[in-house]
C-alpha cells in the first residue's frame, strides 16, 4: 500500500517538474522572440530617423538652390564667374549627396527582412520608411530640375 502512495507522489512531483520546465522553456523562447522584435523595431526607427534627416538635407539644398535661382533671375547684370563657381559647387554638392543617398537607399532596399514573424509596429515603421524613401527620390528629382533651371538662367 505504501508503494502505490509513494509512486503517485513521485509521479505527480515529476509531472509537475516537467510542466514547470516546459513553461520555463516556452517563456525563454517568448522572451527571445520579444527581444528580437524590440531590436528590429528600434533598428527600423533608427533607419527612419536617418532617412528623414537625409530628406531634410535635400530640402535645405533645394531651398538654397531656389534662393540662388531667384537671385540670379533678379540680378541680370551679375558677375558670371561667381555664378559659375557657385553653380559648380552646387553640382558637386548634388553629386556627392546623390551618391550617398543612392548607396543608403540600395542598402535599405536590399536588406533582408529583420524578423521572420510580422508585427504591426514594424510594418508601420516599414511603411513610413518606404514613404520617406519615395519622398527622398522625388526631392532628388526636384533638386536636379532646379539645378537645370539655375544653369539655364546663368547661361542666358
UniProtKB/Swiss-Prot annotation:
Domain of life: Eukaryota
GO molecular function, one term: cytoskeleton-nuclear membrane anchor activity
Keyword hit for Translocase: no
Entry GO CC: chromosome, telomeric region; endoplasmic reticulum membrane; meiotic nuclear membrane microtubule tethering complex; nuclear outer membrane
Topology versus the membrane: Single-pass membrane protein
Annotated localization: Endoplasmic reticulum membrane; Nucleus membrane
Entry keyword annotation includes Endoplasmic reticulum: yes
GO BP annotations listed: homologous chromosome pairing at meiosis; meiotic chromosome segregation; meiotic telomere clustering; regulation of reciprocal meiotic recombination; sporulation resulting in formation of a cellular spore
Keyword tags: Chromosome partition, Endoplasmic reticulum, Meiosis, Membrane, Nucleus, Sporulation, Transmembrane, Transmembrane helix
Transmembrane segments: 131-151
Function (record text): Involved in chromosome segregation during meiosis. Involved in meiotic telomere clustering (bouquet formation) and telomere-led rapid prophase movements.
Assembly behavior: Interacts with MPS3.
Name of the protein: Chromosome segregation in meiosis protein 4
Species of the source: Saccharomyces cerevisiae (strain ATCC 204508 / S288c)
